[in-house]
């Protein structure tokens, strides 16, 4: 067989081998993605999402629909967070809905920055935290943390205390519910410090460090 023909066949054999290898790699990637336990949990909650990529986020997802019946949005950017936080928000949706809330506005989710006054990266840097500030519903109207949250209420026996306004009561009940649900590692409010005067900071642990996936706590309202 002429050497030119042998060379041509050799190139074809190499291309076939490369195609076969590419198919194997794609198959492995697809099976790995399908087996991801966090996104499986997210899909099981009927959340619309798509895979995303952000520096620092271990399992980034972009949320494209409601979370547990609640739309979570910002004015100028999409909600891209770690899947672990997305599952918590979806699971917590029923607590918002029980209080008449169907829309939540956030001011910050994924953001590369340090904890105020330190050199330690904030959990926002990993997509594991979100700051929510406005809550709306068809009967509720619009509630804002900086305007309607009543500080200094409740104690270790009675978390809610005695709010003076309906808006204050809704926000305090929501805070207590989110704390007692166990779905969030941290829930910080204006009672924590002045830096949180206008929002609730909700933070979770990475998926592999979480002891529970669901909350069995009943909604209080």
Model regions: which residues?
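Sec-dependent signal peptide recognition
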Residues: 18-24
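N-terminal signal peptide c-region/cleavage motif recognized by signal peptidases
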Residues: 30-32
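Active-site acidic/histidine clusters and adjacent loop/turn architecture
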Residues: 36-107, 111
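Catalytic cores and adjacent binding grooves of peptidoglycan-active enzymes
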Residues: 39, 49-64, 121, 126-221
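Conserved short secondary-structure elements within globular domains
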Residues: 94-121, 173-189
């Amino acid at each position: 067989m002429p050497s030119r023909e042998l060379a041509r066949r050799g190139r074809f054999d190499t291309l076939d081998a490369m195609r076969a290898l590419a198919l194997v790699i794609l198959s492995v990637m697809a099976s790995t993605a399908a087996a991801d336990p966090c996104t499986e949990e997210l899909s099981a909650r009927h959340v619309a999402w798509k895979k995303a990529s952000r520096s620092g986020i271990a399992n980034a997802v972009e949320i494209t629909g409601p979370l547990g019946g609640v739309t979570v949005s910002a004015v100028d950017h999409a909600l891209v967070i770690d899947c672990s936080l997305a599952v918590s928000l979806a699971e917590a949706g029923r607590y918002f809905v029980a209080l008449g809330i169907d829309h939540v506005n956030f001011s910050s989710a994924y953001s590369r920055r340090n904890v105020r006054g330190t050199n330690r990266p904030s959990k926002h840097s990993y997509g594991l935290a979100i700051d929510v500030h406005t809550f709306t519903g068809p009967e509720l109207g619009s509630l804002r943390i900086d305007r309607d949250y009543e500080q200094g209420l409740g104690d270790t026996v009675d978390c809610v205390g005695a709010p003076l306004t309906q808006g204050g009561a809704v926000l305090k009940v929501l805070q207590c519910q989110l704390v007692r649900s166990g779905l969030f590692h941290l829930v910080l409010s204006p009672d924590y410090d002045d830096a949180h005067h206008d929002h609730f900071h909700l933070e979770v642990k990475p998926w592999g460090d979480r002891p529970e996936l669901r909350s069995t706590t009943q909604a209080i309202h």
